[in-house]
Amino acid sequence: MAATITDDIVATVLESIEEKSYEDEKEKAGMIKDEANQFFKDQVYDVAADLYSVAIEIHPTAVLYGNRAQAYLKKELYGSALEDADNAIAIDPSYVKGFYRRATANMALGRFKKALTDYQAVVKVCPNDKDARAKFDECSKIVRRQKFEAAISTDHDKKTVAETLDINAMAIEDSYDGPRLEDKITKEFVLQLIKTFKNQQKLHKKYAFKMLLEFYNYVKSLPTMVEITVPTGKKFTICGDVHGQFYDLCNIFEINGYPSETNPYLFNGDFVDRGSFSVETIFTMIGFKLLYPNHFFMSRGNHESDVMNKMYGFEGEVKAKYTQQMCDMFTETFCWLPLCHLINEKIFVCHGGLFKEDGVTLEDIRKTDRNRQPPDEGIMCDLLWSDPQPINGRSPSKRGVGCQFGPDVTSKWCETNGIEYVVRSHEVKPEGYEMHHNGQCFTVFSAPNYCDQMNNKGAFITITGDNLTPRFTPFDAVPHPKLPPMAYANSLFGFN
């Protein structure tokens, strides 16, 4: 496998350390740790994690495992973070940060009871630690709320938010001078909406709820796997994660044209979270979906879920810009988003990837019940969370959910289901895209300079109905207002 930029940086750092003097392996590991700490501070998490790994091989300590766990958390590799936190605690049961790291990883995976157990351990050891007490109290609230929600979920007479909305009762203030949605969505309305968002102004709550309710009712009618036909000679565009980077979304349209009946798009999940313009992003997409329902497609990602939205900013942003009721409405709506798309019966598009088990067919996918929060295993979980790996076979996911699947898995699945290749997203790539598995799997990621720190390009894929060979267009990030990523995220648990 070709060396990456990360590999080159790590090699350079290690060469410089070899040129220095050190008394023993313990001191050498400490020097590598110091270098890794600096890369972590500079938010270069790939290099930091690799350097911590080298130091661990030389002289493993609880601190090294704890530090690498933190780097993995930043990379959203929650499974690896859990494993490192366990190792840190095994080496030193009094290492409090090990419990913190494990709790944070479990929080990200929605395993709140396990997280609460670790926060209890920290509070017991550090009873006067205000931060530990705050985390314990907040996690306790979440566990209590989950118990309450589980209890009322058995109430079949409970109405959805959509059923309780009274949009007509929402008054429009005389001072409101933004877009007005009187009847059906029009192209003029959507373009005015984008202009309003670019000027950092809001759509009125009444119109926002009206759009969201219409979108909710529409996506409920869709199948779990949507089938798309691209006619001969016609272009079709596939985009990956956008993650609330509204101004980069607008740049895609500047480069590739606005969505229309002659310029259709598919956005492959993770519309929201992390980027602090997720509200603007999702309402722009909803606008185009309602305007061009048969030419603008949206697939669910792992971040279109309740747990992720609570941790990574979307819930906080919606509450700040609108209301808790709208958060709840989005939660209900996201559960009805399709899980995947099939283009011309040959291109399979999903957010994450393929499956832990052999034998999954397109018909199995069609029959999958998607109206729920993502489970920890099964077809729906794998579609949202899995990643390709370069070696044959399958491996446990470093994310802690889903699996890693090799080229043999992809080849067999494509042959079984008559698929030419798989398009998925879910992972940052330096050029915005990457080919895997001998051209039978492609990653596309459309959030350039992800979180204002990764320096990656974004990309999108174009095909035509008579030429399904993917063509990639990389693009750079564009400026945005001075609101940092994760501005609305749950800072209490380290998710910002």
UniProtKB/Swiss-Prot annotation:
It is found in: Cytoplasm; Cytoplasm, Cytoskeleton, Spindle. TPR repeats lie at residues 29-62, 63-95, 96-129. Substrate binds at H243, R274, N302, H303, R399, H426. Its cofactor is Mg(2+); Mn(2+). Pfam families: Metallophos, PPP5, TPR_8. Expressed in somatic and germline tissues. PROSITE patterns: TPR, TPR_REGION. Serine/threonine-protein phosphatase. Dephosphorylates cdc-37. Probably by dephosphorylating separase sep-1, may be involved in sep-1-mediated exocytosis of cortical granules during meiotic anaphase and mitotic cytokinesis. Belongs to the PPP phosphatase family. PP-5 (PP-T) subfamily. This is Serine/threonine-protein phosphatase 5. The lineage of its organism: Eukaryota, Metazoa, Ecdysozoa, Nematoda, Chromadorea.
